[in-house]
């Protein structure tokens, strides 16, 4: 190899320490900052004086990177020598190294005179087993043969024509490229079968997130995978552990296998040796970053661990990321099933009352508040909804007219009242018999004073309609129509005690006194009848006499439902 093709580092500036002569550079074809020392093809000397001088004064190194690299040399009892850069070297190890290098310098000069001894030292038998150390062996050949073979146990390429900045870049790229290829290769198949069930954009991430689930029955392991636009996987998160072994290769889902990076990474000796041989110079330039220093990843990854692909643990700060889509769907379905099973509390039996009325609202003794109205299917008449106004009472009812009979009102009650029937309002009492009271006043105003005084006894009396409902039954009973007066028994007893003869005598006397009286306008007085059909007073126009007369009719006491006055008639709703 010609000296022009030897690796020569090109620095932007070169600092020459004091007391150093530039003529020392002629002894070696490499610069001071390059520690990959090779013997001179012309003289065979190594020119280590400058290197030893710089090792004794580390503060005079021209490059900050060289300050962190120290060389420790050991004599292994052979004619070869090795440069072994250590991560944690110090200046204390430089003192014995100086004496060792002097001995190696003399041995190398003797070695150049004996060409036959160079062929027996091509392979280093004392290679250190530690993978974190990189060894460099320099073999010296005959004086008239150019020496350019630098290598480890394996053979190296013949041409090494890269500069030191390019070596640094290649070392960084050599670290990044295996990682990206590793992720792509490891993510191709992890040995399990996955099924994709969702994809969405999450907060704080530019790439969409895909959700996968293990296809094995009863396996709850899920996987969250983020893939960039170019197809590179940026993040993989596993949730849970597999409760089954890996399926057989022939049973794997080849087409639908989802990339992931679960599994154990192992580096055998052959692959490690290949990495060292291909990146020997870059490892010497930057020994901290080495592919051989990658530690194996545990086989299973849980929620609390970092995934093998360099991802981060599953984030829990965002509420939308805590649960995946399938778990949300399952929860919603289970909630719907629970709601369907539980349902609403068991409703009380419904009670339907159908009556014929001109008005929709029937007075059943309770107070109601209307809270809605709508038209139901199959009935053109609207349905009104009412609620009991009593506090805490759950009873409701809805009133509607029948579709087949507009005069029929259907009232449906739901629930039971938990309170007594409220007291009737005054408006209800006054509305019970106002028509009869008006008729009596008309009679009194149109009659003479004597007859009007007699008819005052016929003024209407107000009585309360009594509605009853069983406390613990599902039937609502409404007493519609004519009510029974509470003074009915007293009036009946008085009528019976007077006797039919006495009553007839009194009525005949009154007729004789006012028989000759004529009313200016012939007004027919309304006949007030009880259930016995007894007519106590009335007006009758006869052919011969057109005067106002009274006629007493014998009363039927068997019915026992007569009334002493017109006020006993109670109007129904």
UniProtKB/Swiss-Prot annotation:
Q: Which SUPFAM superfamilies match?
A: WRKY DNA-binding domain
Induction of its expression: Up-regulated by sugar.
Keywords from the UniProt entry = DNA-binding, Metal-binding, Nucleus, Repeat, Transcription, Transcription regulation, Zinc
Which residue stretches does the UniProt record annotate as biased composition, category Polar residues?
163-182
Gene3D superfamilies listed in its UniProt record: WRKY domain
For bias type Low complexity, the affected ranges are 108-122
Claim: Transcription regulation is one of the keywords in the record: yes
Does the record carry Transcription regulation as a key word? yes
List the Gene Ontology MF annotations in alphabetical order.
DNA-binding transcription factor activity; metal ion binding; sequence-specific DNA binding
InterPro entries, A to Z: WRKY_dom (IPR003657), WRKY_dom_sf (IPR036576), WRKY_plant (IPR044810)
Q: Which SMART domains match?
A: WRKY
Q: Which applications in biotech or industry are described for the protein in this UniProt record? A: Expression of barley SUSIBA2 transcription factor in rice yields plants with increased starch content and reduced methane emission.
Per the record, which residues fall in region Disordered?
56-133, 157-192, 240-332
| Family of this protein | Belongs to the WRKY group I family.
Record's protein name: WRKY transcription factor SUSIBA2
């Amino acid at each position: 190899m010609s000296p022009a093709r030897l690796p020569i580092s090109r620095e932007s500036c070169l600092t020459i320490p004091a007391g150093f002569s530039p003529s020392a550079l002629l002894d070696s074809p490499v610069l001071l900052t390059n520690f990959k020392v090779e013997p001179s093809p012309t003289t065979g000397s190594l020119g280590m004086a400058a290197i030893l001088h710089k090792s004794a004064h580390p503060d005079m190194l021209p490059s900050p990177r060289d300050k962190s690299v120290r060389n420790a040399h050991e004599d292994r009892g052979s004619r070869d020598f090795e440069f072994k850069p250590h991560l944690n070297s110090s200046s204390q190890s430089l003192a014995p190294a100086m004496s060792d290098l002097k001995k190696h310098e003399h041995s190398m000069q003797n070695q150049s005179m004996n060409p036959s001894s160079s062929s027996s030292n091509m392979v280093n038998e004392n290679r250190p087993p530690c993978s974190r150390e990189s060894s460099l062996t320099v073999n010296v050949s005959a004086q008239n043969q150019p020496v350019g073979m630098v290598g480890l146990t394996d053979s190296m390429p013949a041409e090494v024509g890269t500069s030191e900045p390019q070596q640094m870049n290649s070392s960084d790229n050599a670290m990044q490229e295996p990682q990206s290829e590793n992720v792509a290769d490891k993510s191709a198949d992890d040995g399990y079968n996955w099924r994709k069930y969702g994809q969405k954009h999450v907060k704080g991430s530019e790439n969409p997130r895909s959700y996968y689930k293990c296809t094995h029955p009863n396996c709850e392991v899920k996987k969250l995978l983020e893939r960039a636009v170019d197809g590179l996987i940026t993040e993989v998160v596993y949730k849970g552990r597999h409760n089954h072994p890996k399926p057989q290769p022939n049973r794997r889902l080849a087409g639908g296998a989802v990339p992931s990076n679960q599994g154990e990474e192992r580096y055998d000796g052959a692959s490690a040796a290949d990495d060292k041989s291909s990146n020997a110079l870059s490892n010497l330039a930057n020994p901290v970053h080495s592919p051989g220093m990658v530690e194996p990843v545990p086989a299973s990854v849980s929620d609390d661990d970092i995934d093998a692909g360099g991802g981060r643990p599953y984030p829990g700060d965002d509420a939308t990321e805590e649960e995946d889509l399938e778990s949300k769907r399952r929860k919603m379905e289970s909630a719907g099933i629970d709601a369907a099973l539980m349902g609403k509390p068991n409703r009380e039996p419904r009670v339907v009352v159908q009556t014929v009325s001109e008005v929709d609202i029937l007075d059943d003794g309770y107070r109601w508040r209307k809270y809605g109205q709508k038209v139901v299917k199959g009935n053109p008449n609207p349905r009104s909804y009412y609620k009991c106004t009593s506090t805490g009472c759950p009873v409701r009812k809805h009133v509607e007219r029948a579709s087949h009979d507009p005069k029929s009102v259907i009232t449906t009650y739901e629930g039971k009242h938990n309170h007594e029937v409220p007291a009737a309002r005054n408006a209800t009492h006054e509305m019970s018999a106002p028509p009869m009271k008006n008729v009596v006043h008309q009679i009194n105003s149109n009659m003479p004073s004597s007859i009007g005084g007699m008819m005052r006894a016929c003024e209407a009396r107000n009585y309360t309609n009594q509605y009853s409902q069983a406390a613990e039954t599902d039937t609502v009973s409404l007493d519609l129509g004519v009510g029974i007066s509470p003074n009915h028994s007293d009036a009946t007893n008085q009528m019976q005690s007077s006797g039919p003869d006495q009553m007839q005598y009194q009525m005949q006397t009154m007729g004789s006194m006012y028989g000759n009286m004529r009313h200016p306008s012939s007004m027919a007085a309304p006949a007030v009848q009880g259930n016995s059909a007894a007519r106590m007073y009335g007006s009758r126009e006869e052919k011969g006499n057109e005067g106002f007369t009274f006629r007493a009719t014998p009363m039927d006491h068997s019915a026992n439902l007569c009334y002493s006055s017109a006020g006993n008639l109670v109007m129904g709703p």
